[in-house]
Amino acid sequence: MLKVNEYFAGKVKSIGFDSSSIGLTSVGVMEEGEYTFTTALPEEMTVITGALKVLLPGSPDWQVFMPGEKFFVPAHSEFNLQVADATAYLCRYLSK
């Protein structure tokens, strides 16, 4: 079953699904902008196209992730993103 999600007045959209090979996952696109997300489960984010500038929980420095690169966000935390150009991503929701 597909679940369509929309955030930040439509500037971030994703389609969630449960994959037998990789588990609970969403794939989406972020338009240019700055965003703050919170997590319920641990997340593995992979950039597909574009780039994400990320401030991870507990980190004093922003990091840039390019296509094929991934980062991890702990459960029950908040992280910030800066997007300079439309960027596609894959998000895997990891077990607790």
UniProtKB/Swiss-Prot annotation:
Family: Belongs to the nucleoside phosphorylase PpnP family.
PANTHER family: PYRIMIDINE/PURINE NUCLEOSIDE PHOSPHORYLASE, PYRIMIDINE_PURINE NUCLEOSIDE PHOSPHORYLASE
Keyword Iron-sulfur among UniProt keywords: no
The organism's taxonomic lineage, starting at the top: Bacteria, Pseudomonadati, Pseudomonadota, Gammaproteobacteria, Enterobacterales
Keyword DNA-binding appears in the UniProt entry: no
A Pfam cross-reference name: Ppnp
Catalytic activity: a purine D-ribonucleoside + phosphate = a purine nucleobase + alpha-D-ribose 1-phosphate; adenosine + phosphate = alpha-D-ribose 1-phosphate + adenine; cytidine + phosphate = cytosine + alpha-D-ribose 1-phosphate; guanosine + phosphate = alpha-D-ribose 1-phosphate + guanine
A GO molecular-function annotation: thymidine phosphorylase activity
Record-listed E.C. numbers: 2.4.2.1, 2.4.2.2
Principal EC category: transferase
GO CC, one annotated term: cytosol
HAMAP family (UniProt xref): Nucleos_phosphorylase_PpnP
Keywords: Glycosyltransferase, Transferase
Job of this protein: Catalyzes the phosphorolysis of diverse nucleosides, yielding D-ribose 1-phosphate and the respective free bases. Can use uridine, adenosine, guanosine, cytidine, thymidine, inosine and xanthosine as substrates. Also catalyzes the reverse reactions.
Gene encoding the protein: ppnP
Taxonomic superkingdom: Bacteria
Protein's UniProt name: Pyrimidine/purine nucleoside phosphorylase
